[in-house]
């Protein structure tokens, strides 16, 4: 925690105006928010008009990497507000240089961003941060930091569907319609694995190597990039053997780069896309650094422009949400497994995990091109290799269906993955329920499954422990939020609900007094032409409980949720499992508001499946039949010991407190409600295309 002294100004206003070019005091406050540190600088003055005169009404923020040793003080990315004019970055940079010069400081302008985000990169003294943060149009400033390569033939067999396996890897197509951009070290483009398949661009933005005695050898400088290029599209050991690669050098010979160089590389891709639009683009980011707001924002901008980004989860045996670009929601984040489908261990470290990981892929002892010679091969391990596998699979899927959106591609990658094959005991206990048990695999047919209703589960960050703390989970813009649930390890929660925020529906979960925090869990689905709404029944106060219905004609129940204001609902009468004709309603505790999520979409049909067991039960599950997709997962009110409900693939899981600490009555029941849906419209459309 650091502070900067603040001085009150008592001189007359005319004299103050003469002194405006002199240093002005501020007060700074640093807060460590786990993911990053934020420094908020605001101008303080006795003269109310002084702030307006300087146009310093808005407060900008300063961010830096949470890991001390990764910080690069003296280099800063200045990000302007989104609505600023295209010419504003240069004007703001010139203004900053001029004001710094009057104070005896020199500022070196390293790069101006236009096409990715409005801003610029500067090299300057930390003493000028106060000045920069007070400039008009500045949204935030981030100190530069380091990023690192994430690398420390069973792999091709593993991603091939079982019924297609043979002695030779035979993918459905080569990914020839897709360009893959690789942001990495330099590449030995003459290696026979990738010769003629890789275009080495003239882009290069890398820091100097550490150590004065470091000897640059071509084989060392090209090592990481050459291996990954071979994994993506190598002739013998590649996943997508027909995909073309473009190499951008953002890592030095030691496999080290910076956030700023990665940003400049991403902007290079965006500029190329604008100048010469081509087919589908995949960007492979086999690197990781500390959490970076600006790097995540850049990934978001590029994804919204139609680019698919695939990133390494990181090799730190840690929560991937603490690293970038792995933590960016728009990025497909990949962890690493070995030949036995177990998480990769790398000495004392290993693959990252957690809710920010989308899936895992082969990442141990991966055979690929070696930069030692043009015919050499080498074995490498890490989440970089895992991400390269998924980039290759994505290239093949996009070659088969170039019109796939990022949301559609991600849903297909999840749907066709091998499920429940990873030993979850490897992960920390608090991360097991959050980490997807999925290993990437090619679909049996890249043209098939057009009839399938695709859904995925999105977990929020953990809320704080305060009584009014909330957690929020949201779907991608192209996805529909069909249901919302919540989970608390302590069981102290106040339920969940769907709410509209900024024109989008989000899933909110509420912590309770004495609770340790909650998670919100959104069920996000691809449902074209859907019209969805939520119908709420207020607390009944008496009787069996509350019931919420789908009132609009043609609307079908896709999910149930409930929330309450009291701290403890107490024990409820045993739930009554509904007969077949009453599956258009949600049932809740009489003291809770109950919400029915209802949707109208062409050909949509849904059914409710319920299963109850006498308490205590650690968990009760219900699974949808093949051909049906789980859209809603909730618990019927039958016991006060419910921890929450969440979806794992097409299985609804309701958890209750540990039986050893539970004192339940013989009347209490743990009951799970699964809503399973399918789309006849999608099935018909798929048949027409075939």
UniProtKB/Swiss-Prot annotation:
Q: How is it modified after translation?
A: Cleavage by furin and PCSK5 generates a truncated inactive protein that is unable to induce LDLR degradation. Undergoes autocatalytic cleavage in the endoplasmic reticulum to release the propeptide from the N-terminus and the cleavage of the propeptide is strictly required for its maturation and activation. The cleaved propeptide however remains associated with the catalytic domain through non-covalent interactions, preventing potential substrates from accessing its active site. As a result, it is secreted from cells as a propeptide-containing, enzymatically inactive protein.
Residues bearing Phosphoserine?
45, 686
Glycosylation (residues): 531
Enumerate the GO terms in the molecular function aspect.
Answer: apolipoprotein binding; low-density lipoprotein particle binding; serine-type endopeptidase activity; very-low-density lipoprotein particle binding
Enzyme Commission no: 3.4.21.-
Query: Catalytic positions?
Result: 184, 224, 384
* Domain Inhibitor I9 residue range list: 75-147
- Region described as C-terminal domain: spans on this chain: 448-690
Q: Where is this site: Cleavage?
A: 150-151, 216-217
Subunit description: Monomer. Can self-associate to form dimers and higher multimers which may have increased LDLR degrading activity. The precursor protein but not the mature protein may form multimers. Interacts with APOB, VLDLR, LRP8/APOER2 and BACE1. The full-length immature form (pro-PCSK9) interacts with SCNN1A, SCNN1B and SCNN1G. The pro-PCSK9 form (via C-terminal domain) interacts with LDLR. Interacts (via the C-terminal domain) with ANXA2 (via repeat Annexin 1); the interaction inhibits the degradation of LDLR.
Q: What is this protein called?
A: Proprotein convertase subtilisin/kexin type 9
Q: Which organism is it from?
A: Callithrix jacchus (White-tufted-ear marmoset)
This chain is encoded by the gene named PCSK9
């Amino acid at each position: 925690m650091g502070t900067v002294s603040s001085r009150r100004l008592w001189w007359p206003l005319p004299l103050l105006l003469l002194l405006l070019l002199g240093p002005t005091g501020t007060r700074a406050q640093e807060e460590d928010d786990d993911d990053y540190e934020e420094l908020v600088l605001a101008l303080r003055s006795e003269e109310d008009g002084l702030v307006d005169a300087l146009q310093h009404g808005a407060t900008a923020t300063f961010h830096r990497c949470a890991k001390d040793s990764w910080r690069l003080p003296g280099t800063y990315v200045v990000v302007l507000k989104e609505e600023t004019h295209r010419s504003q970055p240069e004007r703001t940079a010139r203004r900053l240089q001029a004001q710094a010069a009057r104070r005896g400081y020199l500022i070196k302008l390293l790069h101006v961003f236009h096409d990715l985000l409005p801003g610029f990169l500067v090299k300057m003294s930390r003493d000028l941060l106060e000045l920069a943060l007070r400039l008009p149009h500045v949204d935030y400033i981030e100190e530069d930091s380091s990023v690192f390569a994430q690398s420390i033939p069973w792999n091709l067999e593993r991603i091939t569907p079982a019924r297609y396996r043979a002695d030779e890897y035979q993918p459905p197509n080569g990914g020839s319609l897709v360009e893959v951009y690789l942001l990495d070290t330099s590449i030995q483009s003459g290696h026979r694995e990738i010769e003629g398949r890789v275009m080495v661009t003239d882009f290069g933005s890398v820091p100097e190597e550490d150590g004065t005695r470091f000897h640059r050898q071509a084989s060392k400088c090209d090592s990481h990039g050459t291996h990954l290029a071979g994994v993506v599209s190598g002739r013998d050991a590649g996943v997508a053997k027909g995909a073309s690669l473009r190499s951008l050098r953002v890592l030095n010979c030691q496999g080290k780069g910076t956030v700023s160089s990665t940003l400049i590389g991403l902007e290079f891709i965006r500029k190329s896309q604008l100048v010469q639009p081509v087919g589908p683009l995949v960007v492979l980011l086999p690197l990781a650094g500390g959490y970076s707001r600006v790097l995540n924002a850049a990934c978001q901008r590029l994804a919204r422009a139609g680019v698919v980004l695939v990133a390494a989860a990181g090799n730190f045996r840690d929560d991937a949400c603490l690293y970038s670009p792995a933590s960016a929601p728009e990025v497909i984040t990949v962890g690493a497994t070995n030949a036995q489908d177990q998480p990769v261990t790398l000495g004392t470290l290993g693959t990252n995990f957690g809710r920010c990981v989308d899936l895992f892929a082969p990442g141990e002892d991966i055979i690929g091109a070696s930069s030692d010679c043009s015919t050499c091969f080498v074995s490498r391990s890490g989440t970089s290799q895992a991400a390269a596998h998924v980039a290759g699979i994505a290239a093949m899927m996009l070659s088969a269906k170039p019109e796939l959106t990022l949301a559609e591609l991600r849903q297909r990658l999840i749907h066709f993955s091998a499920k429940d094959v990873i030993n979850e005991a490897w992960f920390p206990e608090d991360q097991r329920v959050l980490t997807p048990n999925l290993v990437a695999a090619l679909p049996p047919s890249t043209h098939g499954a057009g009839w399938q209703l695709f859904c995925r589960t999105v977990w929020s960050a953990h809320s704080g422990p305060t009584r009014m703390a909330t957690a929020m989970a949201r779907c991608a813009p192209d996805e529909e939020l069909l249901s919302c649930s919540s989970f608390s390890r302590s069981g102290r929660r106040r339920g969940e609900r769907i709410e509209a925020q900024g024109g989008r529906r989000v899933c909110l979960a509420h912590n309770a007094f004495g609770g340790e925090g909650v998670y919100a869990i959104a069920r996000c689905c691809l449902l074209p032409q859907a019209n969805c709404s939520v119908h709420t029944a207020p607390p009944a106060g008496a009787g069996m409980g509350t019931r919420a219905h789908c009132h609009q004609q043609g609307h079908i129940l896709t999910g149930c949720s409930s929330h309450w204001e009291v701290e403890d609902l107490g024990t409820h009468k045993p739930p009554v499992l509904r007969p077949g004709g009453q599956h258009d309603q949600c049932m809740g505790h009489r003291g809770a508001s109950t919400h029915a999520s209802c949707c109208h979409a062409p050909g949509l049909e849904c059914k409710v499946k319920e299963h109850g067991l006498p308490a205590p039960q650690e968990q009760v599950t219900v699974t949808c039949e093949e051909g049906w997709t789980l859209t809603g997962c909730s618990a019927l009110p039958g016991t006060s010991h419910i921890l929450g409900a969440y979806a794992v693939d097409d299985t609804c899981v309701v958890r209750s407190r540990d039986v050893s600490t539970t004192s339940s009555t013989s009347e209490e029941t743990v009951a799970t409600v699964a809503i399973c849906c399918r789309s006849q419209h999608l099935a018909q459309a798929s048949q027409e295309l075939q």
